[in-house]
Amino acid sequence: MPRYLSLVRVQENTIDMADADPGFEARMGALFEEITKAGVMLDTAGLRPTAESSRLTWSDGKVSVTDGPFTETKEVVGGYALLQCKDRAEAMEWSRRFLAVHPPHWTVGLEVREVEEMPGA
C-alpha cells in the first residue's frame, strides 16, 4: 500500500498556540485517534522553530551550513505526517480533515507527496 508524506506548511511568525480556540486540541486529538485506529497514521510530529535549526547545502563540492532563523522564508515546514493509504484520494481526504480542525483565522497549508519506494526495499 502506498505511503504519503504530508508536509505541514505555516508562516512561522503568524501561528500562536495561545491564539487557538478552546476546542482545537480536542478536535486534533480526536482526529489523531481516528486516523491511528484506521491504521493510516505511521508517524507524525510538529517541528521546533527555525531559530533552532540549520540548513546544509552541497555546492561546488563543499557543504555549507546556515543556522536559522530563516527570515527570508515566508513559509516553513512546521510538521509532518506519514500516512499509508490505499490511494492518493484517501491521503488527500485525511489531509483535508487535518486542515479543517485548525482555527479558521490560521493559515496552514499541506503538501501531500507519495513516497517513492525503492525496489527491493
What are these regions (language model features)?
Residues 1-121:
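Conserved, structured core segments of small domains
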